[in-house]
């Protein structure tokens, strides 16, 4: 790592989001991973999808090896100005209504309203067929 620590704004880092110019923010540090794009085992799409945001969770979720973590040092270019990083939004799953057993009889009634007339019609056709005089 370089001794003069450069502090970069989130806006500046987020501009570098292309295959030939790719910077990532991981654990408050900025890495220029452009030279590593072709060599990344997950492909360049994985790296590109982590641009323009704090990629710490993306990086940690994969479970990188110690070797991979050591490799990061050569791509380090500075630190992120934490005040310029937008607050992360936590995902809140939509609430699903609880299963209501009272609706099950309604479903059965709807099925019966459909099937009973068909059965009556079928029975009428069978009776007519067998009682018809030749």
UniProtKB/Swiss-Prot annotation:
The keyword Transmembrane applies. Residues 5-81 form the Cytochrome b5 heme-binding domain. The keyword Electron transport applies. PROSITE patterns: CYTOCHROME_B5_1, CYTOCHROME_B5_2. Expressed in roots, stems, leaves, flowers and siliques. A motif (AKR2A-binding sequence (ABS) required for endoplasmic reticulum membrane targeting) lies at residues 128-134. Heme binds at residues 40, 64. InterPro entries: Cyt_B5-like_heme/steroid-bd, Cyt_B5-like_heme/steroid_sf, Cyt_B5_heme-BS, Cytochrome_b5. Its main location: membrane. It comes from the Eukaryota. GO terms for cellular component: chloroplast thylakoid membrane; endoplasmic reticulum; endoplasmic reticulum membrane; membrane; plant-type vacuole; plasma membrane; plastid. GO terms for molecular function: heme binding; metal ion binding. Keywords: Cell membrane, Electron transport, Endoplasmic reticulum, Heme, Iron, Membrane, Metal-binding, Transmembrane, Transmembrane helix, Transport. It is a single-pass membrane protein. It is found in: Cell membrane; Endoplasmic reticulum membrane. The chain crosses the membrane at residues 107-127. Interacts with CER1, BI-1, FAH1 and FAH2. Interacts with AKR2A. PANTHER family: CYTOCHROME B5 (PTHR19359), CYTOCHROME B5 ISOFORM E (PTHR19359:SF135). Belongs to the cytochrome b5 family. Membrane bound hemoprotein which function as an electron carrier for several membrane bound oxygenases, including fatty acid desaturases. This is Cytochrome b5 isoform E. It comes from Arabidopsis thaliana (Mouse-ear cress). The lineage of its organism: Eukaryota, Viridiplantae, Streptophyta, Embryophyta, Tracheophyta. The gene is CYTB5-E.
């Amino acid at each position: 790592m370089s001794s003069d620590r450069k502090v970069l704004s989130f806006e500046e880092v987020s501009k570098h989001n292309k295959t030939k110019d790719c910077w990532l923010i991981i654990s408050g540090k900025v890495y220029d991973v452009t030279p590593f794009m072709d060599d990344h085992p997950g492909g360049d799409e994985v790296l590109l999808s982590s641009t323009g945001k704090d990629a710490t969770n993306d990086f940690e979720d994969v479970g990188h090896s110690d070797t991979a973590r050591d490799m990061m040092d050569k791509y380090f270019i500075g630190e992120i100005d934490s005040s310029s990083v937008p607050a992360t939004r936590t995902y809140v799953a939509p609430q699903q209504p609880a299963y209501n057993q009272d609706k099950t009889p309604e479903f059965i009634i709807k099925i019966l309203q459909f099937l009973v007339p068909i059965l009556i019609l079928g029975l009428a056709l069978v009776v007519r067929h067998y009682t018809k005089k030749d």
